């Protein structure tokens, strides 16, 4: 399993107001999507999220989003090391993801770019 990088989750009240700041900071354009009533904008290493508190409450439990080469390989590594998969793997607009709980209780999202 190769870890390619991590994305910092930022929860904002107003996505439209937040995007210009993070675009300027990261030096890139936001890639937007929507899932389950939550608006998302990926800008560099930041993942901005805005939506209903009931949805954000669940998302806030995830410490970070970690990019990997292959979600299936990651699933095998996590479970063999004593972690468990809470959700997924499922398709996303960019590839696939899963949510896993590590043996210490920390929860992470793992994503790949495979279709």
Task: Outline where the language-model segments fall.
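Vicinal oxygen chelate
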Residues: 1, 79-115
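N-terminal beta-strand motif that seeds the catalytic metal site of vicinal oxygen chelate
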Residues: 1-19, 62-64, 114-115
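Acidic di-acidic motifs
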Residues: 14, 70, 102
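Conserved active-site tyrosine of GNAT-family acetyltransferases
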Residues: 18-23, 78, 105
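Conserved acetyl-CoA-binding loop of GNAT-fold acetyltransferases
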Residues: 24-31, 82-84
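Conserved short beta-strand elements that form part of the metal-binding/catalytic scaffold
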Residues: 28-61, 107-113
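Mid-chain, well-packed structural core segment of small domains
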Residues: 64-87
């Amino acid at each position: 399993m190769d870890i390619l990088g991590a994305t910092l989750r930022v929860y904002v009240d107003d996505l439209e107001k937040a995007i210009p700041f993070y675009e300027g900071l990261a030096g890139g354009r936001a890639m937007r999507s929507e899932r389950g009533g939550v608006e998302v904008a990926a800008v560099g290493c930041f993942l901005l999220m805005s939506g209903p508190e009931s949805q954000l409450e669940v998302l806030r439990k995830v410490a970070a989003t970690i990019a990997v080469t292959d979600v299936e390989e990651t699933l095998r590594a996590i479970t063999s090391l004593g972690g468990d998969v809470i959700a997924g793997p499922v398709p996303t607009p960019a590839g696939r993801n899963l949510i896993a709980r590590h043996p210490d209780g920390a929860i992470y999202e793992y994503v790949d770019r495979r279709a």
